[in-house]
């Protein structure tokens, strides 16, 4: 299986506009295969600079927030998304409205 370039994942995060989210699969697809979603998740969990590489903007394919968000858990991810103007209900975002 192709190896994913960690920096390419992090660079992708910096291009997500304020008020928008992406899914793990969208990043995987950008890297060449939607099935890379799990590897993308592992890379994001190892992110050491949440301000420089805003992984809070990544949600599941159903719009669900990450219970294991690396920088403070699901409540912190929710707070950051709401600060960007993204409405969160029941720990999910409306992908029809907010997907980049």
What is each stretch, according to the model?
Residues 1-100:
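Nucleic acid-binding interface residues in structured DNA/RNA-binding domains
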């Amino acid at each position: 299986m192709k190896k994913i370039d960690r920096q390419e994942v992090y660079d992708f995060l910096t291009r997500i506009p304020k008020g928008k989210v992406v899914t793990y699969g969208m990043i995987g697809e950008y890297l060449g295969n939607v099935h890379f979603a799990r590897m993308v998740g592992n890379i994001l969990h190892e992110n050491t600079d949440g301000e420089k590489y805003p992984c809070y903007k990544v949600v599941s394919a159903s719009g669900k927030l990450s219970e294991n968000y690396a920088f403070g858990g699901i409540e912190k991810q929710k707070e950051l998304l709401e600060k960007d103007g993204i409405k969160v209900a029941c720990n999910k975002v409306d992908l029809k409205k907010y997907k980049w």
